[in-house]
From Swiss-Prot:
Pfam assignment, any one: RNA_pol_Rpb2_2
Natural source organism: Lacticaseibacillus casei (strain BL23)
Similarity comment: family membership: Belongs to the RNA polymerase beta chain family.
Function of the protein: DNA-dependent RNA polymerase catalyzes the transcription of DNA into RNA using the four ribonucleoside triphosphates as substrates.
Biological process, per Gene Ontology: DNA-templated transcription
Subunit: The RNAP catalytic core consists of 2 alpha, 1 beta, 1 beta' and 1 omega subunit. When a sigma factor is associated with the core the holoenzyme is formed, which can initiate transcription.
PROSITE patterns: RNA_POL_BETA
One of the record's GO molecular function terms: ribonucleoside binding
Name of this protein: DNA-directed RNA polymerase subunit beta
GO cellular component: DNA-directed RNA polymerase complex
Compositionally skewed regions (Polar residues) per UniProt: 1188-1199
Length: 1199
């Protein structure tokens, strides 16, 4: 037997064809969300308050300090928040201390800081009753970046950018003449030496002493206007810089000093963040820069004088291991520079300097300047960083140092929920800080309390804005559990502070070698967002700095055996090592079998001897994301189709009777477990009670845990979310075990579709162009039936003319239409409703004119009933019919929170049971998608020799050109699994190979080619050729024809052009565009064309008359002028063109009955006459219509 048995949970055993043993379990798949939010609560919030506080007033009399904070119990549970359209949030209370420095008095107080949204266990937020996900953002990391460009003359110019987390950018660049310039915050260029002078090194000699003899530097000094003077020229340089930054303002050295200090060295204005400091130190420290350089001086121990490395030594890994402890010391090769008193910063600057030989001219000595030992706590840039980065930049021309690749994942980092929230909170707090300062100067210092100073509105507003309208706060995709899980693991390069679709080029979107094990190379949307939205790879984790790490098995450096020790490496760290693939064959002791091993180093695939290998992949599926890892035989599919397969699995509709795939990958259990839709046991124990709505587990300590199951709830996508127990009374359950399946799950595994019998054959051309032929059995047996729940709501508001009323008594509505309404006018649960039926009867007061004496008398006698009301009932929209599943009524009397002006709100849930039908979209897991073209009676479908009819016929033409051969392999293995009565797992890149496949096919007693003779269901004759028949997992996707089919009768029109609106949502018409007009012109179908462009579109008068003519059975009148023509005339007149319309007799035609031309100002008499004519006309029409009451009613209604 090929393969071995593996248990997935307690309810499923699969035969697995994996050969590689799993040394590491998959991490919790939503950890990226939950860990980040937990960090925010534990540390992020406190960091924010510590940053902003203490707040001092302008005179220094008062000081407001932060003491601590606590989150109290949430007002609603998760379920209550959903029902009440509220937020799942907890009140945040902050303890503040106000110190009065004049009197020494200290006041402490608890201040309420608003309700703070909490994350649910599933990694989501409930905002206004809807579940939302905060997507992690992929951004450029703060740090120092070096880049080069080659111009058309093949000259290489270099550039440097210092990117902070927030603050001004600092850029260096060389021009075509090799002169070095600096730009501050994208302004005009300044010679590099001017910035050095401004930092307090005013004379040329100071600069040359520090940086050494560099060609570019010398050329820059030549260009510098303050050259050839021995005395310091700091002030002049400062004035020059100020003039460039603030042109037109009076320049003084003092204002320039304070400006530069504020731009770069003020921690409140400039922030590198801890990750920026880490990256800057890593890039500029001599530890990384000395590697592979040749020393131009002998290095000795400062204490003993013992030589560590001789002059002329090349610094390789071994030499660096000896040097490293010394480079970490403060007293090793450290030079202290004292800037002049006129400089921006006057503190001594410590730099580490070592001489090495140039790579370009080997005997030339070059100063390598490191930024000294700057602690992790220094979050802003310091002069040492500026000087060391300049040195790195100048040394690039000598061949020292390396160019950065900005698409390398060592230079891109993840901002998860916690950090995004923290940034938003900072915005709110800094706005609040301004208010506090102002209030401190206004309030009486003797009596003021912290509560009086604080205004929490900006803080609350910024958090609300973030959750409500940020590009990264998204309505959760709840089509199925895989869609949920993927949404929580999504990485977006878009959003505030990220890229925009239009500016993103190919490089950013492309797959980079550092994506390996960190980001999925396959799962990304098709279309404008391709490559900008990615998915976290299955084993990847995010480190505290926000860089993605992936696990590797360590290879022992002395025995060269692969150990089970796991190291998580960032992309930067991985660049230093050689990594073998997970499928490299190993002996039992962990040594490599082969004499050469296929391995990776940076972007090279190399064959190398095993003793050079440092690490080995943990698992073959560490390359791909969760959805991609659910595709069996992924290695046999073309990447474009695999992309579609991964994306379409997220769109599968949860079915009424889900079945897990016969051919799985072993990923189904983990995906379902971590998705958050299943019910997991919180504690171990024994099941005491089970029914459809509740499971009770007796814990080992004697306490009882009760789990309430979700029954027929509407998901965000309008699908049915339902949970069903999979345990029975007496079962023992472990912690974290699945005790109830969620939607699209079976026995704790993901079950997105079904396992039908599929044949690759044509059937009467019905499966031309990816169409699908279905057997009626799939309809009859509810194989692909799904439940959809739609929510409708109606509000009764206060209007200017009185309150709206929910009632049964609706004007002009017969008893038949009210049969399902209760005494209050709300539809009953269980009623079957069709399009246009009333769900909530509601009337709104009409505008009442001044009443006459008689009417007032009637009012007094009969009360309110005589008042005019109009029908504003909630009705079932087109295609929305079904069965009323639930009705919820919210009123102020019952204590529900309603919006202002709303007295009552009714919510109605309608359930539809949708069977598969012609027009529905279906797909397999290999990107093999299609739409149903015909449903054939079971008896007419082709059948197998044993009489079993085939369920689905797919076109064989869908395979060769698309190169997704995985579907054919799945088909054969699926048939073998069905015949053997087993489920199989074939993990990605480590699944069944052709030997395993044919061995299993043989074991199942199938033909050696995997094909079968098929018989025509209509004639009973065998088909000419043998056909590939088998079991393939096939899903119904959420693009159903019921949601798309649409027809318009008379509907809304656009206000200006008077043409029908477009789209199903607006009950719009079909667009008849330019090319369609050409088609009718080519046919010579003049009358058809005329009526399309007039009656059916924007001939306002004509369409009313046409309607009347149709109702009365009269001939259709001649068409009039389309409204859009009049719009065109008016637009041309608005441009100042005197546009007139002439008839055949060259006389001007008036486009309106009355034109408001200046020559033709209409008199009051003329208006009165016109009104009288109109009244008369109406009276005539009314008389004519009275003859036929029925038609009059219908005309009125439509009008």
């Amino acid at each position: 037997m090929a393969g071995h048995l593996v248990n997935y949970g307690k309810h499923r055993t699969r035969r697995s064809y994996a050969r590689i043993k799993e040394v590491l379990d998959l991490p919790n798949l939503i950890k990226i969300q939950t860990n980040s939010y937990q960090w925010f609560l534990d540390e992020g919030l406190k960091e924010m308050f510590d940053d902003i506080m203490p707040i001092d007033d302008f005179q220094g009399k008062l000081s407001l300090e932060f003491v601590g904070y606590q989150l109290l119990e949430p007002k609603y549970t998760v379920e209550e928040a959903r029902q009440h359209d509220a937020n799942y949030s907890a009140p945040l209370h902050v303890t503040l201390r106000l110190t009065n420095h004049e009197t020494g008095e200290i006041k402490s107080q608890d201040v309420f800081f608003g309700d703070f949204p909490l994350m649910t266990k599933q990694g989501t937020f409930i905002i206004n009753g809807a579940e939302r996900v905060i997507v992690s953002q992929l951004v450029r990391s703060p740090g120092v970046y070096f880049h080069s460009e080659t111009d058309k003359n093949s000259r290489v110019t270099y550039g440097t950018t210092v990117i902070p987390n927030r603050g001004a950018w600092l850029e260096y660049e060389t021009d075509a003449k090799d002169i070095a310039y600096v730009r501050i915050d994208r302004t005009r260029k300044i010679p590099l030496t001017e910035l050095v002078r401004a930092l307090g090194f005013g004379s040329d000699q100071d600069i040359i002493n520090m940086f050494g003899d560099n060609d570019s530097l010398m050329l820059t000094l030549e260009k510098d206007v303050h050259k050839n003077t021995d005395d310091s020229r700091t002030d002049e340089a400062l004035k020059d810089i100020y003039e460039r930054l603030r042109p037109g303002e009076p320049k003084t050295a003092d204002s320039s000093r304070s400006l530069l200090y504020a731009r770069f060295f003020d921690p409140k204005r400039y922030d590198l963040a801890s990750v920026g400091r880490y990256k800057v130190n890593k890039k500029l420290s001599l530890k990384t820069r000395l590697l592979n350089q040749v020393l131009a001086e002998t290095l000795a121990d400062p204490d003993t004088g013992e030589v560590i490395a001789q002059k002329g030594t090349k610094v390789d890994r071994q030499v660096m291991d000896k040097l490293a402890p010394y480079l970490d010391r403060d007293d090793f090769k450290t030079i202290t520079y004292q800037p002049s008193d006129q400089g921006v910063v006057t503190d001594p600057i410590e730099l580490q300097s070592i001489k090495v030989y140039s790579q370009v001219t080997p005997d030339k000595e070059i100063n390598l300047i490191g930024n000294g030992h700057i602690g992790k706590k220094v979050k802003h840039i310091v002069p040492a960083d500026v000087l060391a980065s300049m040195n790195y930049f100048l040394n690039l021309q000598e061949g020292l140092g390396s160019i950065d690749d900005i698409d390398h994942l060592g230079n891109r980092r993840i901002r998860s929920v916690g950090e995004l929230l923290q940034n938003q909170f900072r915005i709110g707090l800094s706005r609040m800080e301004r208010v506090v300062r102002e209030r401190m100067s206004i309030q009486d210092t003797a009596t003021v309390t912290p509560q009086q100073l604080i205004n929490i509105r900006p803080v609350v507003a910024s958090i609300k804005e973030f959750f409500g309208s940020s590009q990264l706060s998204q309505f959760m995709d709840q089509t199925n559990p895989l869609g949920e899980l993927t949404h929580k693991r999504r990485l977006s390069a878009l959003g505030p502070g990220g890229l925009t679709r239009d500016r993103a080029g190919y490089e950013v979107r492309d797959v980079h070698y550092t994506h390996y094990g960190r980001m999925c190379p396959i799962e990304t949307p098709e279309g404008p967002n391709i490559g900008l939205i990615n998915s976290l790879a299955s084993y990847a984790v995010v480190n505290p700095y926000g860089f993605i790490e992936t696990p590797y098995r360590r290879v022992s450096w002395d025995t060269h055996k692969v150990t089970d020790k796991i190291d998580y490496l960032t992309a930067d760290e991985e660049d230093n090592y050689i990594v073998a693939q997970a499928n490299s064959p190993l002996n039992d002791d962990g040594s490599f079998v082969d004499e050469t091993v296929l391995a990776r180093h940076k972007d090279n695939n190399i064959e190398i001897s095993p003793d050079k290998v440092d690490y080995m992949d943990v698992s073959p599926k560490q390359v791909v994301a969760v959805a991609t890892a659910c595709i069996p035989f992924l290695e046999n599919d073309d990447s474009n189709r695999a992309l579609m397969g991964a994306n379409m699995q997220r769109q599968a509709v949860p079915l009424v009777n889900p079945h897990a795939p016969l051919v799985g990958t072993g990923m189904e259990y983990k995906a379902a477990h971590d998705s958050g839709t299943a019910v997991l046991a919180n504690n171990a124990g024994t099941v005491e009670y089970v029914d459809a709505k509740q499971i009770r587990v007796r814990r080992e300590d004697g306490a009882l845990d009760a789990y309430n199951l979700m029954k027929f709830k509407r998901s965000n996508a309008g699908k049915n979310y339902n949970q069903r127990p999979i345990v029975t009374i007496g079962d023992h359950v472990d912690v974290d075990e699945i005790i109830a399946d969620g939607p699209a799950m079976q026995n704790g595994e993901l079950a997105l579709g079904q396992n039908p019998i599929i044949a690759f054959m044509t059937w009467n051309m019905y499966n031309y162009e990816d169409a699908i032929v279905l057997s009626e059995r799939l309809v009859k047996d509810d194989v692909y039936t799904s439940i959809h729940i739609e929510e409708y709501e109606s509000e009764a508001r206060d209007t200017k003319l009185g309150p709206e009323e929910v009632t049964r008594e609706i004007p002009n509505v017969g008893e038949e239409a009210l049969k399902d309404l209760d005494e209050f006018g709300v539809v009953r649960v269980g009623a079957e409703v069709r399009d246009g039926d009333i769900l909530v009867g509601k009337v709104t007061p009409k505008g009442v004119t001044e009443l006459s004496a008689e009417e007032r008398l009637l009012h007094a006698i009969f009360g309110e009933k005589a008042r005019e009301v109009r029908d504003t009932s909630l009705r079932v929209p087109h295609g929305g019919g079904g069965i009323i599943q639930d009705v919820k009524i919210f009123t102020r009397e019952a204590g529900d929170e309603l919006s202002p002006g709303v007295n009552m709100m009714v919510r109605v849930y309608i359930t539809q049971k949708r069977k598969i039908q012609v027009g529905d979209k279906m797909a397999g897991r290999h990107g093999n998608k299609g739409t149903v073209s015909v449903v054939v009676p079971e008896e007419d479908m082709p059948y197998l020799p044993d009489g079993t009819p085939v369920d689905i016929c797919l076109s064989p033409m869908g395979v060769p050109s698309r190169m997704n051969i995985g579907q054919v392999l799945e088909l054969h293995l699926g048939m073998a699994a069905r015949n053997l009565g087993i489920h199989v797992a074939t993990p990605v890149f480590d699944g069944a190979n052709d030997k395993d496949l044919w061995a299993t096919v043989k074991e199942a007693g199938m033909a050696s080619d995997g094909k079968s003779v098929l018989y025509d269901g209509r004639t009973g004759e065998p088909f000419e050729n043998r056909v590939s028949v088998g079991i393939m997992y096939y899903m119904k996707l959420s693009h159903m024809v019921d949601d798309k089919i649409h027809a318009r009768s008379i509907g809304p029109y656009s206000l200006v052009t008077q043409q029908p609106l477009g789209g199903k949502a607006q009950f719009g018409g079909q667009r008849f565009g330019e090319m369609e007009v050409w088609a009718l012109e080519a046919y010579g179908a003049a009358y058809t064309l005329q009526e399309i462009l007039t009656y059916k579109s924007d001939d306002v008068v004509g369409r009313v008359k046409t309607y009347e003519a149709i109702v009365k059975g009269e001939p259709i009148p001649k068409p009039g002028v389309p409204e859009s023509f009049r719009v065109l005339v008016k637009e041309l007149q608005a441009l100042g063109l005197d546009m007139k319309v002439l008839g055949a007799d060259k006389k001007e035609i008036e486009l309106r009955d009355m034109d408001d031309d200046e020559d033709d100002i209409v008199s009051v008499d003329a208006l009165a006459k016109f009104a009288a004519q109109q009244e008369e006309k109406k009276a005539h029409e009314a008389a004519a219509q009275a003859t036929d009451g029925k038609s009059a009613n219908s005309t009125d209604d439509k009008k």
